[in-house]
Amino acid sequence: AAEGGLKYWKLAGTWLEEERAEYRLARSLLQAQNHASAVAHAERCVDVCIANNASPFERFFGYAVLAIAQLRGGDRPACAVSRQRALDQYAMVAADEKQWCEAEVNELRS
């Protein structure tokens, strides 16, 4: 379902929907224990954010899912870099948006 969502958001949506669909697909792949594919889609999520000068809120989620995927895939050095990038973006997230980041922040800090 997540792959279908990505396909159709790329056709009908903006970069924001594509980025969020990449995030959702990475999360789904993590649930399926497909860590390598999760890393690839998380990297694409981050790439879309960078290419479109996304807000810290969007970048936070990209780097967070990337760090989580890298950790579960056993790449601790890459995870440490992505984790720090996620937390750096989180520090710049608007106060009224931080509540939406709590689950990922807790996951990064555990």
Identify the meaning behind each predicted range:
Residues A2-K10, E43-A51, Q84-A95:
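Amphipathic alpha-helical segments of tetratricopeptide repeats
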